[in-house]
Amino acid sequence: MLLSDRDIRKSIDSGDLGIDPFDPLLIQPSSIDVRMDRYFRVFNNSKYTHIDPKLNQDELTSLVEVADGDPFVLHPGEFVLAATLEKFTLPHHLAGRLEGKSSLGRLGLLTHSTAGFIDPGFSGHITLELSNVANLPITLWPGMKVGQLALFMMSSPAETPYGSGSLGSKYQGQRGPTPSKGYLNFSSEQDSD
């Protein structure tokens, strides 16, 4: 069941759903608008010959902090990681789905590549996977609305929510745009093959 604005407010007011910083004006009829933070991760295209998900390529990205009052310029064909200004803490019975804002999509900005699902129990800033598919550069301003988070009531609370020790939740508590930790999905047995 998709939460309505009134159910989103109830969940926040009860302390069930955590959003920090919270602005009540961000609540939409069936979602919460999310804003862009000032941190971006850019890819170091000359450091590696290719991306290998099996390897920990620490120097694949560099963190860039945009100065107050300045935008980040995303050029055509570029892909960067960014993050929401807001930190979200989802209870064990709510899951989220991040979508872009239609006004930005109409300009050629894609907000996420594939990772729009937010598990119950997640706590942290949501990493955004931004792509410019337009023919012109797009300026990205810290604090601008960049997406919307829809929340779904689950049929029952998750038995093993995100962040549980047994899951190996790699992105729990993340702050800022967090690079891939996909290499942790490969076991040491696979590494010896």
Swiss-Prot record:
Q: How does it assemble?
A: Homotrimer.
Q: Which CDD domains match?
A: trimeric_dUTPase
- Tell me what gene encodes this: dcd
GO process annotations (BP): dUMP biosynthetic process; dUTP biosynthetic process; nucleobase-containing small molecule interconversion
What name does the UniProt record give this protein?
A: dCTP deaminase, dUMP-forming
Any keyword ATP-binding? no
Family named by the database record: Belongs to the dCTP deaminase family.
Q: In which pathway does it act?
A: Pyrimidine metabolism; dUMP biosynthesis; dUMP from dCTP: step 1/1
Q: What does this protein do?
A: Bifunctional enzyme that catalyzes both the deamination of dCTP to dUTP and the hydrolysis of dUTP to dUMP without releasing the toxic dUTP intermediate.
- What InterPro entries has UniProt attached to this entry? dCTP_deaminase (IPR011962), dUTPase-like_sf (IPR036157), dUTPase_trimeric (IPR033704)
Q: Where is the composition biased (Polar residues)?
A: 167-177
Q: Name one GO molecular function term.
A: dCTP deaminase (dUMP-forming) activity
Chain intervals for the UniProt region annotation (Disordered): 160-193
EC number assigned by the record: 3.5.4.30
Q: What are the positions of the active site?
A: E129
Q: In the UniProt record, does the keyword DNA-binding occur?
A: no
**Chain positions recorded as dCTP binding sites:** K101, S102, S103, L104, G105, R106, D119, T127, L128, E129, Q148, Y162, Q174
Q: Where is this site: Important for bifunctional activity?
A: G116, F117
Q: Per the record, what are the reactions this protein catalyses?
A: dCTP + 2 H2O = dUMP + NH4(+) + diphosphate
The record's listing under NCBIfam families reads: dCTP_deam
**UniProtKB keywords:** Hydrolase, Nucleotide metabolism, Nucleotide-binding
For this protein, the record's Pfam families field holds: DCD (PF22769)
Q: Which organism is it from?
A: Corynebacterium efficiens (strain DSM 44549 / YS-314 / AJ 12310 / JCM 11189 / NBRC 100395)
